[in-house]
Amino acid sequence: MFSRTSIKYLRQWAAKEGRKPLVLRGARQVGKTTLVRLFAQEFDTFISLNLEEKENAELFSSDNSFEDLLAAIFFKANVPQDSTRRTLIFIDEIQCEPKAVQSLRYFYEKRPDLYVIAAGSLLESLMGRHISFPVGRVEYMALHPCTFVEFLMALGMDELARQVEDFSVPASLHTYTLGLFKKYMIVGGLPEVVSCFAQYGDYVRIGDVFNSLLSGYRDDVEKYASKPKEQDAIRYILNYGWAFAGHRIQFAKFTNSDFKAADAGNAFRTLEKTLLLELVYPQVTASFPILPDLRKSPKLLWLDTGMVNYVVGMQEELLFCNDADELWNGDIAEHVVGQELLGASLAFGEKRMFWVRDAKNSQAEVDFLIRFRAHLIPIEVKTGVNTRLRSLHQFMEESKEKVALRLWNGPMTSDTIARSGGEPFTLYNIPIYYAGHLHVFLQRKIGGMAFG
């Protein structure tokens, strides 16, 4: 069991005045249960209830009062109700009993002294059906696959992890850190895979873990959807959709399958609710407001880059490749950057963004946009040295921003670039391993100088 940076948020939540029950939102196998058990070591009493177990679900399914429910929970755990002891109650797989979801409001209203965390692996797909969380009585935290920093921590490299977080990796360690980031691209961030690699350092052995996790995702299809046609479409996506990671897709023509656009679209949206993937729709203007154009083709980003590489058989090629731009036209590098950008926030509902211009005689696409204060910052992922940034330049011609970012394999550098009819902007070339901490860079390294 290795530490996760998200445990810092759990500590902040526990110390907060007016604390509400916390609902962990995240895909299957991102480490929700393990994180809570790690956090539980900081409490006097820990009660864990997995509602997939019938006897635990029955505690909530009866029509007893909340006081009787609470008494039953403590009785079953064989621990006394002692208000002098810090007690953490963990309700896992809460989606298995809707009444358990409703009980969260009473924990907030009647027993705010108790620390309550709920989680469920299929929570997202079921949210749109029969489960409704009590409004204003719970708060949420998103949990994603391990970030590069957490990967380093799992390998026992805490000092290097701190340097990556602080944007302070010494120049002498640049190549070494880049090599570790490539390992992270291959292994990915699913905790069970990371733990296996940290223990054995074996790329072959982690394949067995990937295969087991993938089988679990596929076996859950019947839980994701009830209609046979939608189940078939979901199975097809889980079998073949990984090869389109980082690509813009069209439902009507997805991998030349026989599924109708509506069926493919519904299947993708169902998988999106489970947080196994995200359909990222483009921004078409270079300024606020942020309004993704749902009429345009979305970009497909999967939960984990390591899983993508395993399914499509790219691990060996990536291992011996010096430039990620050579693989999939750079899609793998772009995909792992997207994963790092999402992992940088624990706020649920964060959406990644990219920009396109689809004019008849002028097409362009910037890999990502991030919001920093009142600014919309473009990011291009171009790991090679001799690469053009035509799309980024087109974005900056339409934008009033003074800063653009390029993530690459090289060292930290910057260029001042002229633009027609306006003042120049600064292009910062940033090592790709800093992808999850760009807000730190923008705040600490640029500050008022760039945005003044």
Short names for language-model regions:
Residues K32:
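Conserved lysine of the Walker
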Residues E53-R85:
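Short glycine-rich substrate-engagement loop in P-loop NTPases that contacts/grips substrate
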Residues M153-V336, G343-L346, M353-N361:
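Interdomain hinge/linker elements that couple catalytic modules in large macromolecular machines
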